[in-house]
A protein has these predicted regions:
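Histidine-centered active-site/metal-ligand motif
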Residues: 46, 78, 111-112, 136-137
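Acidic/His-rich, divalent-metal-binding segments that scaffold phosphate/diphosphate chemistry
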Residues: 2-94
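An active-site-proximal "capping" alpha-helix that borders the catalytic cofactor pocket
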Residues: 49-57, 109-122
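Histidine/acidic-rich helix-loop-helix segments that form or flank divalent-metal centers
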Residues: 75, 120, 125-176
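Divalent-cation-assisted or electrostatically stabilized phosphate/pyrophosphate-binding catalytic cores
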Residues: 93-118, 175-183
């Protein structure tokens, strides 16, 4: 696989202890196969990075053990949608709709709800954990209502911004080299 994380996850042992059932589950491992924010970034890579960031926030806020566990579990599963949104099948599905109907079915708007339902079915998450997953795309989704949901949302925004900057950085430097080449 061309994706960055291989073998044993470098996660903190406490995260491993609180979410080992998720990290080691075959359906979670399948997220390695879906490209996410850039060519060298998989949904698995992104989800683990969001969990690490969310864990750091939870520790800084001195959340209880139970709340910290919920933050980690929701963060790991916030993108547990289980499909490749770049795939032709998804594009075909979208082409049936137009206007606002198409817009509201786009990946950015729907994947939180799909991930929450899939996470609940696969891992039996709590309602608060599912809500954090469903609302992590605020402001494209409803506003988070709990600390857990806000932490997952903020961790996701921070990690996604870093990943997109890295992915776009290559294009920006290439464009600059072409633009300012002195030939």
């Amino acid at each position: 696989s061309k994706h960055m994380r291989k073998g044993v996850s470098p996660l903190d042992s406490e995260i491993q202890q609180l979410a080992g059932d998720i990290l080691n589950h075959p359906r979670f491992q399948q997220l390695r196969d879906f490209q996410h924010h850039g060519e060298s970034n998989s949904v698995y890579d992104h989800s683990v990075a969001v969990a690490e960031a969310a864990y750091a926030i939870a520790r800084r806020m001195r959340l209880s053990g139970d709340e910290t566990a919920s933050v980690i579990r929701a963060a790991l599963l916030h993108d547990f949608f289980g499909y490749d949104w770049r795939d032709e099948r998804f594009r075909r599905y979208l082409r049936q709709y137009s206007g606002v109907g198409r817009l509201m079915r786009m990946h950015a708007f729907i994947h939180g709800h799909i991930a929450a339902a899939r996470a609940k079915q696969t891992f039996g998450l709590t309602e608060r954990e599912c809500e954090a997953i469903a609302r992590h795309m605020f402001p494209l989704a409803a506003m988070p209502r709990t600390r857990i949901a806000w932490i997952v949302t903020l961790a996701d925004k921070a990690v996604a911004s870093r990943e997109m900057a890295a992915a776009l950085g290559g294009y920006v430097s290439l464009a600059c080299r072409k633009l300012f080449a002195y030939n």
